[in-house]
Amino acid sequence: MTGVPIAIVRVAALGAMGTDLDSMVAALRGDHSGIGPANALEQRPASEAGAGQVDLGVSTDGASDGSQQHTQRADRAEQLLRRALDQLLGTDPTATLAVDASQVAMVLGTTLAGMRHCGAAMRFESSGCISDAMRSYTGIPAGSVMRQALAGLPIAGAASTVSCACASALSAIAHGCAVLRSGAASCVIAGGYDPISEFAYGGFSALQLVATGPLSPFAHDRQGMKLGEGCALVLLRPLPEALARGESPLAIIDAIGESSDAHHLTQPHPEGRGAAVALASAVVNGLPDLLIAHATGTAGNDAAEYQAYRTAFGAALPGIAVTALKSRFGHPLGAAGALELLATLKCADAGFMPAGLGRPVDRHAFPDINLLHTEPRAGSPHRITVLAAGFGGANVALSVTRGGNGAPVTVTERRAAPTSVRVGIRAVGCVSAGGRGLSGLRQLADSTERDVSEETLMPLLDRSRTRRLALLPRLMLAACRDLRDAAGLTADELASTPLLAASWHGAASFTEQYYRDLLASGIDLANPVLFAESVPNVGSAHVSLGLGMRAASATVIGTRTAGLEAMFLASCRIRVGEWHRALVVMADESHPTIDAVLSHCTGRAVRSGSAGMAFLMERIDGSNPELLPEVTGFEHGIVERGGSRPAMTGHGGATIMIPEIGCVAGPAALALEIASRQSNEVAVSCTDPNGFSWTVQASAHGDLKSFATV
């Protein structure tokens, strides 16, 4: 990490161990487990394995009457997020934030967003309640969950949701720090959430990852995980500003490490290589006094994680205290890592380190792990590191140093982030109904076709490796390989390049197949292949796997503007010096249910199409003297909810006719505007039906490399 230190000035969390952090600390002092009956599951499994469920009885903590009414109408995702926001911001959110609403950014992480609404919609359809079904379908995207939870709050800055499965919350915090350091916001709310759901329970059970006995991390007879739920949020400010305001930071973010295994969709690398890389970056400033393990209790995860610890810490490992709290919270998916970190920080303030539960450690397999088991240990660790890992091989490790509550807080001198870094677009890749490249995009407005043909895809894909994949990752892989041909990237260059994917609706076809089968066959007979191919970050996962990309990876999800949002986040990471380049890829599938829902929302017939597009964004500096098209800025806002637009607003207010190709539409319009050379300065705007509005500004000088065959 580079630039000014970032302070965690306020925190909030809900989990199976308590509906606020104070109640969690009290529970973690003893031997209480939050694992119990999973009454909130939409279906009951034949064998009750239990889960970590949050008590969402009506709360009055820090919530206005309006937010109370809101949470009673919402499903669990919106309730968890809104309750945490109310805790975080208190009774006077405007005074708490103390900056203009446009300067408050939000980066959230989630595994499944509003997926519970999908099951509700399908049940409404089966009952013939079509209007209710359409309304429920609109609640699935992450943008809908976020917009509902933000109702009435003074938050109007950049707002995005990222997904890299169970590493989502820590990934969101990493991106939030970059947004803050880039100057795009004065403060950032970051963290993650996920509710318990039949979608997740059925899938993990089908993969044989759910334990019937206790979750027992690093034990010889460990059986697997327990599903959980929760939400954990932090309010971030630059440390100098926080101190100037008289705020007492709970902690300072010391370092963050990110990596990808590029190994398997649902299994970690057996030697923990990616996790070791992330940990090494996170502890560059010093070893932790306490390590919060990911520790899902599955055979593969715990073995790989231990190998990562041995690689990262070596002979120092036995001296580092380790805690594994999913044995008490369950696995909260998109809140994982952040939830355990905040609970542990509060326990440290209270003078103890919390312990996990379950069966004893297997000392033969894990001889060097100093695991806190059953009994909390007295102590107030100064430096704490947390690791999170997710499907697709994403790894994020984060280290903090405690501050406030009597601990000294100082501003540490660090290398300043670049103040005038320029970000260029070296190359683009594209597949659309018009064919391959920008020439294909140009034909879309006049084409009657809406979907990418197999004739376009197959020359770009290894059929033996991709024929069983969902369409979404195939579109992304094809666009990336088109870009690779344009830019001439080597395998080594790809391996070290960070990856940000984007999708509005994800793998829509496989998701529908999985969920309809789940409802027809029952929660105990879910399809494991369809589940793995339906998670929102499946695109970034398969691109990482297919191209051997081992740096940071995540997917921006749930809005029509997700493609522009991914470009914004990549631009922030490049501008603050964390990344030199980034591969940004976006894709969306067409689907009749998407068309029906958008038609219902907008009052006009919508016929969506499929497309994939990739951008190679990189820093323009002395080592890169070429004249490249340049991304000069972004504007963003939250406006009144409205219909999805079939076209983009370009330079001078002119309308660029782009068919409905999801989150690809905005970036496609940008590429066409740059390539047209009608103006040196380009601006393209796009708005999501939930009111998230984004504009990207660019200078069109230089050559935009693209593979233009059709």
Give the positions of each predicted feature.
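Short acidic donor-binding loop at the edge of a beta-strand
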Residues: 186-189, 383, 580-581
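Conserved "HGTGT" condensation-loop signature of ketosynthase/thiolase-family condensing enzymes
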Residues: 1-157, 178-181, 197, 202-226, ...
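Active-site histidine-anchored catalytic micro-motif
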Residues: 172
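Short loop-beta-helix segment that forms the pyridoxal 5′-phosphate
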Residues: 158-163, 553-556
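Short glycine/serine-rich loop segments
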Residues: 176-196
